[in-house]
């Protein structure tokens, strides 16, 4: 079955541990794109520990870091270097719609 039609309702999707989110932050990742409904588990009582770890909230908030969840990448997109054009709606909120566009780069 195509990943475009995956039903995540009550399935317990894959998610990041707070330690994994911290690792990505320490590695220098500014814009995290993930193909699951959330970086946190479905039932976490609103703790959002992976979100908070990635953003270093509330100690040292990384206000320019972003998390884009539930992305869809077609199987035809092969691994390699890409330029990311992360377009976001001009909504002042803690969450907004985004439209990530990938442009393949040629390694010379």
Feature roles, as predicted:
Residues 1-108:
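Active-/binding-site microenvironments in catalytic and ligand-binding cores
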């Amino acid at each position: 079955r195509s990943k475009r039609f995956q039903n995540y309702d009550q399935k317990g999707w894959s998610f990041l541990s707070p330690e994994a989110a911290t690792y990505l932050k320490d590695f220098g990742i500014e814009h995290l794109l993930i193909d699951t409904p959330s970086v946190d588990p479905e039932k976490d009582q609103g703790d959002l520990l992976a979100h908070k770890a990635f953003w270093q909230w509330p100690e040292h908030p990384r206000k320019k870091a972003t998390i884009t969840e539930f992305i869809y990448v077609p199987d035809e997109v092969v691994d390699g270097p890409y330029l990311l054009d992360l377009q976001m709606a001009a909504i002042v909120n803690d969450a907004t719609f985004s439209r990530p566009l990938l442009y393949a780069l040629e390694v010379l």
